[in-house]
Swiss-Prot record:
Keywords: Aminotransferase, Lipopolysaccharide biosynthesis, Pyridoxal phosphate, Transferase. This is GDP-perosamine synthase. It comes from Vibrio cholerae. CDD domains: AHBA_syn. The gene is rfbE. InterPro entries: DegT/StrS_aminotransferase (IPR000653), PyrdxlP-dep_Trfase (IPR015424), PyrdxlP-dep_Trfase_major (IPR015421), PyrdxlP-dep_Trfase_small (IPR015422). Homotetramer. The modification N6-(pyridoxal phosphate)lysine is found at K181. Pathway: Bacterial outer membrane biogenesis; LPS O-antigen biosynthesis. Its cofactor is pyridoxal 5'-phosphate. It comes from the Bacteria. Optimum pH is 8.0.
Amino acid sequence: MIPVYEPSLDGNERKYLNDCIDSGWVSSRGKYIDRFETEFAEFLKVKHATTVSNGTVALHLAMSALGITQGDEVIVPTFTYVASVNTIVQCGALPVFAEIEGESLQVSVEDVKRKINKKTKAVMAVHIYGQACDIQSLRDLCDEHGLYLIEDCAEAIGTAVNGKKVGTFGDVSTFSFFGNKTITSGEGGMVVSNSDIIIDKCLRLKNQGVVAGKRYWHDLVAYNYRMTNLCAAIGVAQLERVDKIIKAKRDIAEIYRSELAGLPMQVHKESNGTFHSYWLTSIILDQEFEVHRDGLMTFLENNDIESRPFFYPAHTLPMYEHLAEKTAFPLSNSYSHRGINLPSWPGLCDDQVKEICNCIKNYFNCI
């Protein structure tokens, strides 16, 4: 079976893990945590970065640090992974869904603008599948209305807009290092910000609310969201090779684009002025071929090729369907039903990508 994703672990991961074990520093303190935070901040060119145990708690921590709570509203694209929405609710706030632009799969700035009201506290910009949303326009919109901008960059490490990496536009931004992400720490996440105040609140909230310099004195109801030194060691090794990994993934996307040309689909495009990191290479079937999406996925599976459907829009999920009519977001609904994520891990060889493409061609020759 050719999997959708497999991490690339052929750098210093084993060496750094063994160093942790030999040193005894295997929990939430150690030199690799410090290194990962420092080097990640340098990679992004952002002032502060703090590690956490996964990408979901990164979002919850970021919003908690902003004081988002009951009575607040956070605008979020309905076309996103569910954690983006769940963490808003976990803060006690109300998610307000926004439509996507279309084939970019990114949130519509115009629809975000329409959803702003006196209860709006923040906008969560999600960079879907490695492409950047119109983040500068969202930054300008939030500044105009006095709102926080949160960037969910779980799928977009290395993605950039006009040479500036995503994660540096928001008041606070988050990343995920789950095993299927562009770089992994096994489980893990990062919160980044240029604000001393926001990052200080994150540091205290992620560490049980302890007061610096006064051991076992806590003045906040807080959390244990810390990353282990073991996970950070893997993260450091991965970050050393991030540019190489992203290049491999972009090369894979280009083979897909070339080989699948002429079929009733498009490979997710790179928007003008952006650098797409292609976390997953996504194909979008033409609208009249929507009914063949699941059949194509089954055909791939029968030929030992794993694929994944696009996310379901959040407003169609049982716990959120009361917040909007299921037909309220026609673009999100349509693209969700037409999209497939193909194998995209950096170790895929050209022949494997071409094998996948030939399988897709065979399917369309048979229908």
